[in-house]
Structures are given as structure tokens and as C-alpha cells.
From Swiss-Prot:
Localization (cell): Nucleus
GO molecular function, one term: DNA-binding transcription factor activity
Keywords, alphabetical: DNA-binding, Nucleus, Transcription, Transcription regulation
Protein's UniProt name: Probable WRKY transcription factor 63
DNA-binding region of this protein: 97-165
UniProt source species: Arabidopsis thaliana
GO cellular component entries: nucleus
Protein's GO biological process: abscisic acid-activated signaling pathway; regulation of DNA-templated transcription
Length: 241
């Protein structure tokens, strides 16, 4: 039944579904109405656009070919880095390593931390320390995904435009980060702040909703949905953000 399913389209729809659930929670609670919902709304619209463009693409590859490449990428490695599909014009890189990459050649400032429903470990969010001073919109998130053996996943989003980029352009960190030049500064700013806005919304909604019930009961988890409906495939390689 799902032999011709398009990975990219499904991933985009699942991502939009998750954002829609968060948006519903925010709108249902007047106490969090002061939080800007524009980034979530834009993300939901982009998810539908990406799904439609993927389904209608004349160059779409057969499912079994792309699936074989995805499965090959799941072989455990000591340390691996992978380019992840993103929004048009945006490239995201992910790195799995036995130790957290605290020194990747750049200076980061932590701006958020949250508990992930399907994980025992919290996810930490960072942005470039020069985000305000030099309008550098590079961000990253770090999360331990298993403890035996330990594996830390670092996801990089955006390219450093600060002065530090020229000093460290040969470091491991700069190799992990890339933005297509077609992305304008205004788009970069919007994409870089979506993660931060989502964290603020979820934290505030959790604070209110947990007074009576758990907000997670109202959020559909992509990985659980994917595992139940499409057990032959993994959602990890389809992560958009």
C-alpha cells in the first residue's frame, strides 16, 4: 500500500502536523497569546508547500532506490556527519559522536532546553554568541540519544557570518555548517528563530497545561507515528529541523 510513498512529502506533512498541534495549544490558552505564532504558521505553510512540490516533482526518484540509500546511512559508525534535507535553499548538517562537541571552532550561547517525549535525555539549543552584535544566525542543538555506548547528536543550522567565521574556516565546525547563497538574510533570520520561538511556546504551554493535564497527550510524536504506520522506514533521515 505504501510502496510508492514519498519520504520527503510524508516528513514535511508530519513536521507540519506537529507544529499545528503546538499552535492549537497556544491558541487555546489566552495566557500565552502574547507569544508570536507567526513562525509556527509559516512553518506549517512551508511544510504543505514542500510536500506538494515533492509529490509533483518530475524528477522524483523511485521509492525503493531512495530507501536503499537511507537504510545504508543507518549503519552505526564511530562518528558520522550527514547532510539532512531542509527547506528550499537551506542545508542542515547532523553529527553523531561519542562525546559532545563542545569545541567546534565557534562560540555558542545556550538559549533553551527542553524534554523530548520519546527520549530520556533533554535537548539543548544554542545560537552564535555574535547573533545580536554581528547578525549571525547560525544555530545548533545538542542531545544525548543513547548511553551505552554514549552517542551525542549535534544538529547544525545555518552559516556563520560573524568575524569568527574567517578565523575558524578550516575547523571541523565550519565543515559541518552550510547555507546556499540563494538564501537572503531576512529568510535566514526567520529560519534561525523558528526553533527558539517553538521552545518558548512549548515551555509556556507546558507550564499552563501541566496544572491540569500533560500537554504531551495533545502532541502527536512524529517518530511514534512513523514507527506505527510505516515500520519499514525510519523518520530520523527525514528530519527537517
Amino acid at each position: 500500500m505504501f510502496s510508492n510513498i514519498d519520504h520527503k512529502a510524508v516528513a514535511a506533512l508530519l513536521h507540519g502536523q506537529g507544529c499545528a498541534n503546538i499552535l492549537k495549544t497556544v491558541l487555546d490558552n489566552c495566557k500565552v497569546s502574547s507569544v508570536s505564532t507567526e513562525p509556527l504558521i509559516n512553518t506549517i505553510l512551508d511544510s504543505f508547500s514542500l510536500a506538494l512540490s515533492s509529490v509533483n516533482s518530475p524528477n522524483r526518484q523511485p521509492h525503493h532506490e531512495s530507501s536503499s540509500r537511507d537504510m545504508a546511512g543507518l549503519v552505526p559508525q564511530r562518528s558520522s556527519k550527514k547532510k539532512i534535507c531542509g527547506v528550499k535553499g537551506l542545508e542542515i548538517y547532523r553529527d553523531d559522536s561519542p562525546n559532545p562537541r563542545l569545541d567546534d571552532g565557534f562560540t555558542w550561547r545556550k538559549y533553551g532546553q527542553k524534554t523530548i517525549k520519546t527520549s530520556l535525555y533533554q535537548r539543548c539549543y544554542y545560537r552564535c554568541a555574535y547573533a545580536k552584535d554581528q547578525n549571525c544566525y547560525a544555530t545548533k542543538r545538542v542531545q544525548m540519544i543513547q548511553d551505552s555506548p554514549p552517542v551525542y547528536r549535534t544538529t547544525y543550522l545555518g552559516q556563520h557570518t560573524c568575524k569568527a567565521f574567517g578565523v575558524h574556516d578550516n575547523t571541523y565546525g565550519s565543515e559541518m555548517i552550510n547555507f546556499d547563497q540563494v538564501v537572503s538574510e531576512s529568510v535566514m533570520r526567520q529560519l534561525a528563530t523558528i526553533g527558539e520561538q517553538a521552545v518558548l511556546m512549548e515551555d509556556e504551554a507546558n507550564h499552563i497545561m501541566n496544572q491540569e493535564y500533560d500537554i504531551n497527550d495533545y502532541l502527536v510524536d512524529d517518530e511514534v507515528f512513523w514507527g506505527n504506520e510505516f515500520p519499514l522506514f525510519s523518520s530520523e533521515d527525514l528530519m527537517l529541523f
